[in-house]
From Swiss-Prot:
GO-annotated biological processes: mRNA processing; RNA splicing
CDD domains (UniProt xref): DEADc_DDX46 (cd17953), KH-I_PRP5_like (cd22474), SF2_C_DEAD (cd18787)
Compositionally biased residues, Basic and acidic residues: 835-848
Organism: Chaetomium globosum (strain ATCC 6205 / CBS 148.51 / DSM 1962 / NBRC 6347 / NRRL 1970)
Notes on the domains: The Q motif is unique to and characteristic of the DEAD box family of RNA helicases and controls ATP binding and hydrolysis.
Any one GO cellular component localisation term in the record: nucleus
SMART domains: DEXDc (SM00487), HELICc (SM00490)
Motif (DEAD box): 586-589
EC number assigned by the record: 3.6.4.13
Name of this chain's protein: Pre-mRNA-processing ATP-dependent RNA helicase PRP5
UniProt biased composition (Acidic residues): 220-231, 858-870
Amino acid sequence: MTITEAVAVMEEAIETVVGHATEAQTERDRQIAEDNGAEMVTGTTAPAKSTPTQAQTEAEKKAERLRKLQAMKEKHAQKEAKEAAVTAGSTRMLLAEMDQKASGTPGPNSPVAGAMSPAPTSPAPPMPYAGKFDPKAIAKSSKAARPQSPTRLGDVKLAAPAPKPLGLKKEANLKGAGLLPANRAKSSTKRKIDMDDEEVIKRKLVKLPDFVPENADSTPDAEGEGEEEADDLDLLMAQNEEEMAEAHRVLQERRDERIQKEGMAMDVDTETPNGETKDEAENEANVESKDEAVLPAPSMDVDEDVDPLDAFMADLEQTGSAGGIGSVPARQKQKAGKGFEPEAYFSDDDYGYEEDKADPSSILAMASKKKKKDIPTIDYSKIELNQIRKNFWVEPQELSQMTEDDIADLRLELDGIKVSGKNVPKPVQKWSQCGLTRPILDVVEGLGYEKPTSIQMQALPVIMSGRDVIGVAKTGSGKTMAFVLPMLRHIKDQDPVTGDDGAIALIMTPTRELCTQIYSDLLPFAKALKLRAIAAYGGNAIKDQIAELKRGAEIIVATPGRMIDLLAANSGRVTNLKRATYLVLDEADRMFDMGFEPQVMKIFNNVRPDRQTILFSATMPRIIDALTKKVLREPVEIQVGGRSVVAPEITQIVEILDEGKKFVRLLELLGELYADDDDVRALIFVERQEKADDLLREVLRRGYGCMSIHGGKDQEDRNSTISDFKKGVCPIMIATSVAARGLDVKQLKLVVNYDAPNHLEDYVHRAGRTGRAGNTGTAVTFITEEQENCAPGIAKALEQSGQPVPEQLNEMRKAWKEKVKTGKAKDASGFGGKGLERLDKEREAARVRERKTHKAEGEEDDFKEEETAEDAAKKDKAKSAILAAASAIVSRESAKADASEAKPLPAAAEGAVKGGVTVNAGKGGALDKAASAISEINARLARAGQLRPGQPIDNKGPDAGAFHATLEINDFPQKARWAVTNRTNVAKILEATSTSITTKGNYYPPGKEPPSGSDPKLYILIEGDTELAVGKALSELTRLLREGTIAAADAESRAPASGRYTIA
């Protein structure tokens, strides 16, 4: 059959498909109608006309779709006929190419497989097919033609398809018309098969023509995609083998073109055996012909008589024999003797990561470093810092005209201001002279501040000039505004905070309450100047504060502990102090009194060196002068009213009472206070937290509304308590010294020191909660005769404030000084803070003890404690005591022998007594002394044959062991005695040694000897059949006794609990 005849047969088959489909549909409709009629006869409940009507409708739809398909095909055939004259040469070229492929001998000028070829076109309209369409007959004729194919197995070539189709419409038209299924245009991921042992070449599998069984039913389905697939299958079956391969070539070309247009990720860059990409091979194929290394695609030119798998395997063998080293792609190299080595994408090696070796020392060092919360150290010498402006002070003309005498008189009038330093600016007298901006002055006027206070008059010009300042002023004198107003001017002069920049101003306070109060005072100014401020203190979730810092802030008000947490969080990436140029310590002296010096110094060392530092407090003892020299540079010291002085507006009353009369006197004071005015507040200070809760219950029982606040309460409770106290919800508040700093309540008229403060600074701050901002108040202090240590501070405060000192209080002060002189008592200033390192050590020691207690049997310790001199002394003491208590192992035969014949303590027991180290007893030093002590004990026991004078050794019964030893435990601590008599420990020793352990004697208190004729002191008798068993048991008992003794000594040396709470 020639190519022209094949084209004619294909067109006739298309015409026949349409007619056959119409007849088949009509036959199905008739069958459905007959079935529905049978159902009506048998009495079914379905309507009689519904099904035939529906079948007719479906038949009409099917017929309409087939008519549209036929019209499209006719239009396409007419267009091809018009192009036949133009493409006649191309058609002849295509026919010649197909004839050459069928004969197996390529012509001299034939194009290489893979080059672009025009699509087949029919030169004339098809002739009608006179016969009946029979798919089975067509399949049989196709099968009969297969043996005549000249293509051999070895001649099958695989090559990439041609890139472009010519003269045909896009595949979307065929799919929309129902010729192609919707999912056929989608390409699945190509699987790559490795069946070669030496070389691997990446190949792409192409879908082969659909296999149609000979007895397949060609009746199209009536639903969805089944109809389209049936029509397409009928179309393919109506062709011969060569035309079928050509049709698949066209479909593959259209599919590739659509994929390229849609940008789908397909493997179109597959390498050829020569190392070139497919596109490069195709471009070269258009210029010159290639050798047979370039193989045609199996889905285009492979005859159906060759099995696809056989063709693929044969092609692999041919390529493997012809390929060289260069044919193996770089990403699919194969190791000798091994399978295919996959390539890792997005590997850690691509980024240069290197895994550190698991060094235990480095892991422990890293763990301890994370636990320590170290702040990243910043070396400012290697950082180029921007220059900042700190001096904003311009002296007004009014002040410049004042003489030195005028300035001295002015300072004397302003509560006796004292300044020290070089070139101290003159004090101002009104807000307009301070050099503040207009928005700041508007807020000041809105808050009702008419004129500056004494400390503000002198501190504002000094701070505005950029100098470091130490400010000491009485409580309630406006110290907060003295450092806040210059801070705002300092911040506005610098660039805005952006990105990861830290804050410009940092204010640190010792208590959370003072932190919140300063923050609330800042808010009106920050809002007016569009600045952001953050209050960072403990008790609240740190994640919220970190989130605020991430958004950026110019001002941070914080406590030292929480500030260190923020600086150390995430290895210092949360915030930093690189831009912090204004640093304030409010109530600075109390920070160091509370033990914050290490934390404060860490923060100071992390701030840039050209900062401006301001220290403010109501008390500034000389003891912290050394600190100020470390952190300040040429400071100006300002004192208003002297150091540690109670304001003159406060009336101070000191009463010496017994402990039982304090509460009655407190009720009298409260009754007198609220008899005159109901809208007043009273603040009661106590020493301990449990005392605050106990006093709260007693006051509530008397009908007074009150609340308590102390460090043991949650921060939210503390905040709400202070808020309610200020609003008057609860007019009485009971607190520890945690509320003695920064608490500012205008209606506070009475302060009661229920428990007297133990040093001057605490007393000044407690009394300073009242009489603030020019108001009057009363401070009453209860002191007992036993509290002589509190008398010196209270008496000094009365003297400095110009108030009389009670005679009895003066006598108590003298008595205390006499005790200090004679050495019976020790005076303490209150500044004994050493940071939190001591607490960390105590927690670590407790953790080690807990791990030892809960350690599983046989588990080895994974930590090593550092033995101090104190620990060594405890072990030596326990060792000597055990040496004196343990006896030698004596047999029944030698019980009455001479002391020189007694057997010494075996090496195992002696090693246990000496701390687990066994040595020869002949060496000098302390070991000789221990050996001589053991010999003396053995000699005494063996010579007399008695445990104690007058007491026989009681292992003479019929069941007594051949060897025995004793261990006296009467004079050891209770923990040690319990360790060697505990049933669990004894049972383990009995099981391990097969000995008998008996506790005998009576317990006598330390220092008491047993009377004559009574039982001896408490001891343990160890009996066994062999000397080795008795020695092993004695060794274990002495080890337990030594550990118990050391544990008891540790418990005694530890400081007792704070006593704030007790467990009932």
